[in-house]
């Protein structure tokens, strides 16, 4: 990642500023998996298919590269009013290459490249946006109104594999509004509304058909539309030198939510599955669709307590209720809890020790629920040479080598439970050294680039 901001303040009008920003971001990922089959003990019902079964080697790489250019202008009008405007251009290139290699099952021969089932997919997403905002400050009251226009250009190409190239353009108008009331010099109350657009990431879009498990296939959907989410929130904050707290209640809804959908289907209903890959039986097929209606009610709190000049305790708590409804009568609802907390202690001679704990309950999905999660870490830091040299040691999840994840999905005619475990024990050391003297603090630009429009998660369509 990298970026640069240029900001110019008016020498005559306080609060008037002009900012130019550029940011580049890239997120490469690779995967390498082998699926080898022992066909000697297959059930008689699967004999015909097992004779055609082949070992698989899947070599995959996904990457998203963003270039963002942004210009912002802010100016006061009198003592009470502020006008903001700006333009933004995002050039987002998604790429996904999945190469498949095959050999006869239970054979030690070399793998051979399978061009028919390999895919090289490109998805270019250009976003042109402009916004206009108005701000008001009058006594204890403050308010903001804003509107943003976005024009999106999508260009999809298949360099290798099945799929038709396509290009589409669409427009969105995104409003926002907020109202604040200053209760005291240290506390505030705020009411707000905003609309958010979440574009599917490469994991959701990847069209590669993963059939390494012949009874459970998965595939992304390159024709997904962006989610449009509406949210209302009410928050209270109070900040003192000793104690800080922020409490927020939030309600949000989405009518075209991107959801993972698993169905028990005939293999003839999977267009990218060739005849020689079919088992002759119904199979589970997972993909993503814009079918979900999501309703979320959340309550969150952040607390920071400076117990002494050397001791700090902090916590971030979240509780929410989610209701999901999709096509074909699919629906699910439930509660989700999240907690993050820790403490930091400073000792003599610039020794600092911190401990953090994180946990969450299973998250709600349209057809089931995901896994709970628990993690913890310790960090020890020591400064030397008038804080020029810093040494840090950290350890996380040191009592348990693996973290186990469990998910439960059910639909018409099937129930699927899966268990996975991943290494989670971490140890590390870091060293930093500051060269030169910092005579004054470096000022940051008041405006900079933030891109948070990509929906995270996904992965069923990739190896």
Language-model-detected regions and their locations in the chain:
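Transmembrane beta-strands of outer-membrane beta-barrel pores
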Residues: 8, 24-30, 89-93, 138-140, ...
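Repeated loop/turn-to-beta-strand initiation elements of outer-membrane beta-barrel proteins
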Residues: 14-16, 80-83, 140-143, 186-189, ...
